[in-house]
Amino acid sequence: MPFKRKDLLGLRELDVHEIEHILELAVSLKEINARPIKKVPTLRGKTVIHLFYEPSTRTRTSFDIAAKRLSADTYSITTAASSMVKGETLLDTVKNLEAMKPDVFVLRHTVSGTPHRIARHTTASVINAGDGMHEHPSQALLDMMTMLEHKKKLDGLTVAILGDIAHSRVARSNIWGLRKMGAKVILCGPITLIPPEAHTMGVEVSHKLGEIIPEADVIMVLRLQKERQQQMLLPSLREYSIYYGLTAEKLKKARRNVLIMHPGPLNRGVEISPDVADGPHSVILDQVTNGVAVRMALLYLLGQK
């Protein structure tokens, strides 16, 4: 099935067949990363520009490696290195870069909706690498790829998403993607960190971690942003950890083959204990590995437009 979209802006707008197509392609491309020479000429002569206006380690590095393994030329621009520090708007930056004839922009921005706005004003393809609290589609795709590798299916799985869901673009993309693929999604966290629109998203909500652990095939732990305590959304990090931190003791109630996931970066000892993060149920590093394959698939599909 050909991928007809110019851009990849979010999972909410993709259908099941498009998601399946991306995941199948990612699986086929993953073996390139195990070769002694990890490079194919697929995107030779193509140019990918990374525009990151928010800190990133895994996503930016992963996209850069993915592009280079497909033989694309890559260039990275951050806020500090861009003309935005001189007052230039993002749209003007993109229009000037577009005049240099790139093929793909990979864009991360603090403001929700920014990739959509930029995509309307450029002929190059745009990949959303995370926009505000809105979406992070490539993260959700690599999460689903990891679940498929270990569980062999998504349809019928019960996936619990634990933590600061209200402010999480990772959670939103996973909700849209997993629900479309037939998974049951349970959100768990304090009432102050559950989005008010949760009841409209086709998910279940629980405020008691002990109730959802025995039911889950996958537990996805989200990073607790420490500024939430300063915003008075939490009494303290210690209290959050007591009630919602995932520990080996709490995991004793879990299914024997439960998967533990985390998009990173981790706050060890807050939302997840070190023995769980590094334990036998953890597939956190598998997520990182699969991130390269998923981003290769996205660049493959959009870079050849």
Swiss-Prot record:
It catalyses: carbamoyl phosphate + L-aspartate = N-carbamoyl-L-aspartate + phosphate + H(+). The keyword Transferase applies. It is an enzyme of class 2 (transferase). Pathway: Pyrimidine metabolism; UMP biosynthesis via de novo pathway; (S)-dihydroorotate from bicarbonate: step 2/3. L-aspartate binds at K86, R169, R223. GO terms for molecular function: amino acid binding; aspartate carbamoyltransferase activity. GO terms for cellular component: cytosol. Keywords: Pyrimidine biosynthesis, Transferase. Pfam families: OTCace (PF00185), OTCace_N (PF02729). It comes from the Bacteria. One of its GO terms (biological process) is 'de novo' UMP biosynthetic process. NCBIfam families: asp_carb_tr, PRK00856.1. Belongs to the aspartate/ornithine carbamoyltransferase superfamily. ATCase family. Catalyzes the condensation of carbamoyl phosphate and aspartate to form carbamoyl aspartate and inorganic phosphate, the committed step in the de novo pyrimidine nucleotide biosynthesis pathway. HAMAP family: Asp_carb_tr. Heterododecamer (2C3:3R2) of six catalytic PyrB chains organized as two trimers (C3), and six regulatory PyrI chains organized as three dimers (R2). This is Aspartate carbamoyltransferase catalytic subunit. It comes from Syntrophobacter fumaroxidans (strain DSM 10017 / MPOB).
